[in-house]
Amino acid sequence: MATTTSITTTYAGEFAGKYVSAALLSADTIEGGGITIKPNVKYKEVLKTMNLDAITKDATCDFSDTSTLTLAEKVLTPKELQVNLELCKSDFVSDWEAISMGYSAFDELPANFADYLIGYVAAKVAAKNETNIWAGADANEGEFDGFTALLAADASVVDVVGTTITAANVIDELGKVVDAIPAALYGKEDLYIYCSQHIARAYVRALGGFGANGLGGSGVASNGTTWYNGGDLAFDGVKLFVASGMPTNDMVAAQKSNLFFGTGLLSDHQEVKLLDMADLDGSQNVRVIMRFTAGVQIGIGADIVYYT
């Protein structure tokens, strides 16, 4: 059975306007440059990590090893995923767009709907991918282990016990994360606190003042809750990265260079194929096909703070 389709459009003599869909969550962790991308991982890629103990010692006349180098590795293995949809062209015959389909018995899928469909499916995949990056679980259909699953399984990660975050406690909780950041990382250019939209909203509200958390009645620049205009956020000198796929009350403090996303070909994430079945089996179906690989991995666990 072909996938059920539902079209909402308007018609006034000629086709007017574009299809309107609900705003889609973009894969902002990728598009915003929040993690390191490995775009050409054919099957798997080994990420080498190394650690040195005390590297300087008192001088002597002899050569003596001053440090021990410990090598380790993490394996980034993208998971194969796919999208398969089938649409019946007859579903469009009674639509106001029938004029654009041509008058042949073998109607062609309207070009503007095809464009919309490609964008819609790609955006849906991007939204799911954003969630997978942070909260995915490999055991679930269409998912791979996200960062939170990997961090929870790594004993070397710096764990911070979390709670339900509100505007009243968000500053204290962010403070716990910053306090747990290793001294060697604080101040690094690519260090971020990755947080959910929920936490970012609570932080913005707290900085709006009105007595919240003792900040006074007027908030930032005496603008109250109107102070925020969508710009970058920071806390105690550490930049905040709002990751829409992050679990509601979770935070991760890490360097971008220590978080990796791997895929076979980067372009696969924005490629959807439409296959008209009329010439193949005589049906009125159009198939939408998308295949890609995706996965994430962390580098050095001891350099990551996980609040949960």
Question: Residues of each region from the PLM?
Answer:
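Short helix/loop capping segments that flank catalytic or ligand/cofactor-binding pockets
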Residues: D95-W96, E130, A202-V204
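Short coil/turn segments at secondary-structure boundaries
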Residues: E97, I133-D138, K188-S196, G216-V220
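Alpha-helical scaffold segments that mediate packing/assembly in large oligomeric complexes
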Residues: A98-A180, Y307-T308
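Ordered core of a single globular domain
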Residues: D172-F210, G219
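Long, hydrophobic/aromatic-enriched structural stretches that serve as scaffold segments
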Residues: T56-D115
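Sequence/fold signature of self-assembling virion shell proteins
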Residues: A2-K57, D145-A168, V204-T308
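Intrinsically disordered or highly flexible coil/loop and linker segments, enriched in small
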Residues: L25, A126-A135, G187, A212
